[in-house]
């Protein structure tokens, strides 16, 4: 069972270009480094995170429609950062209200040179028409907030 990020990436992603592998390696190194102090991902188990979180995020790319995406409650950038890496021609908005997550996302954006990413510190309940994108995604998001929304609000 491989334990280093590079070996796990090779095992999981069979046709990954060197460029994409390099970007994922940088991102994952940052993610696990920050996780030690900020708890920004579900697990410190690298193999689990890559196989379960990163690869699942990558698989979303074939289902995504439109030219722009908003990742609500982006946290550590999953799936938003992964979508941005594999879709450099698409705009990706990473939305979170926690300063520690925003700091990480800004650093990841800079380190990965992701010009297609816009990091926004804001609660998703604040309606901002400037943040309108073609597709909205979220994962590990509290149902309490969604359950308070009207039917129409869930699709706006």
Predicted regions and their residues:
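S-adenosylmethionine
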Residues: 97-156
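Conserved SAM-binding loop of SAM-dependent methyltransferases across substrates and taxa
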Residues: 76-89
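Conserved SAM-binding motif I beta-strand of class I
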Residues: 91-96
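Conserved class I S-adenosyl-L-methionine
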Residues: 66-75
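Alpha-helix termini
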Residues: 52, 86-90, 126
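Class I SAM-dependent transferase core
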Residues: 2-66, 104-115
């Amino acid at each position: 069972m491989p334990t280093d990020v590079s070996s796990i990436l090779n095992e999981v992603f069979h046709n990954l270009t060197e460029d994409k592998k390099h970007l994922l390696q940088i991102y994952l190194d940052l993610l696990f480094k920050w996780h030690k102090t900020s708890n920004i991902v579900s697990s410190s188990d690298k193999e689990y995170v890559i196989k379960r979180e990163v690869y699942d995020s990558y698989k979303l790319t074939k289902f995504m429609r439109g030219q722009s995406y908003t990742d609500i409650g982006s946290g550590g950038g999953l799936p938003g950062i992964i979508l941005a890496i594999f879709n450099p021609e698409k705009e990706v908005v990473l939305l979170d209200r926690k300063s520690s997550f925003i700091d990480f996302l800004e650093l990841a954006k800079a380190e990965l040179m992701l010009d297609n990413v816009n990091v926004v510190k804001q609660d998703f309940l604040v309606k901002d028409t400037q943040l309108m994108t073609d597709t909205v995604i979220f994962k590990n998001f509290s149902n309490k907030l969604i359950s308070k929304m009207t039917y129409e609000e869930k699709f706006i």
